[in-house]
């Protein structure tokens, strides 16, 4: 695919290489296997062989492995320079590095203002290590009592680890009775209308509304 797309460069400006999401609903579909640590690492190596060549030719890498590949391969995330101004960030390429860098920069320039707020933050399995790191830093700098939890995707299957495909059903079932504090913070991409920060009429992929989830969990989302 990379070789075919490379014929259209520089009209093709960037290529995101993302692992296919395999749900548990695959009866009768073409047999496909999820990536392992080994195969994810092999994919990264192939992509980087091409990207080094493109870097010399075009000045940018052009093709980039998504964050999921690095997580699956258990390799460290690249630095900001690797991503050439993040042309594929909306496809999960460099999102981890960008968020972490931005968070710790803001933390370094903000005044420390101790607070006694108590909140619970949830995310998907993939992003949990990063979100936990950021929440722990917020606690250390501001005294916020932050409980960080990961939601396992039982609705689509445990192979689906991104926060954007979590449902209200899994949120309610896994967090009922476990929430600490007066607020539950969720990734906005869990909602269908993720351009809106309002809970009015917004809902999850399984049609459970935010209002219904708030009522079931007895907490403000």
Residue ranges and their predicted role:
Residues 1-3:
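Active-site-proximal cofactor/substrate-binding loop regions of enzyme domains
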């Amino acid at each position: 695919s990379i070789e075919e797309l490379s014929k259209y460069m520089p009209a093709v400006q960037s290529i995101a290489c993302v692992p296919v999401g395999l749900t548990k609903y695959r009866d009768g579909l073409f047999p496909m296997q999820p990536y392992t640590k080994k195969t994810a690492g092999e994919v990264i190596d192939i992509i980087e062989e091409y990207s080094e060549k493109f870097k010399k030719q075009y000045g940018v890498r052009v093709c980039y492995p998504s964050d999921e590949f690095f997580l699956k391969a258990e390799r460290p995330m690249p630095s900001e320079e690797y991503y050439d101004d993040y042309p594929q960030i909306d496809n999960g390429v460099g999102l981890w590095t960008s968020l972490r860098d931005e968070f710790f920069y803001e933390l370094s320039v903000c005044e420390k203002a101790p607070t006694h707020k108590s909140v619970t933050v949830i995310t998907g399995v993939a992003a949990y290590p990063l979100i936990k790191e950021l929440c722990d830093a917020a606690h250390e700098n501001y005294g916020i009592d932050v409980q960080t939890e990961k939601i396992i995707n039982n609705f689509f299957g445990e192979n689906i680890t991104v926060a954007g495909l979590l449902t209200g059903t899994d949120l309610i079932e896994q967090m009922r009775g476990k929430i600490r504090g007066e607020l539950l913070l969720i990734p906005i991409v869990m909602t269908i209308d993720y351009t809106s920060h309002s809970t009015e009429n917004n809902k999850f992929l399984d049609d459970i509304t935010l209002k219904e989830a708030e009522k079931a969990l007895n907490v403000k989302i």
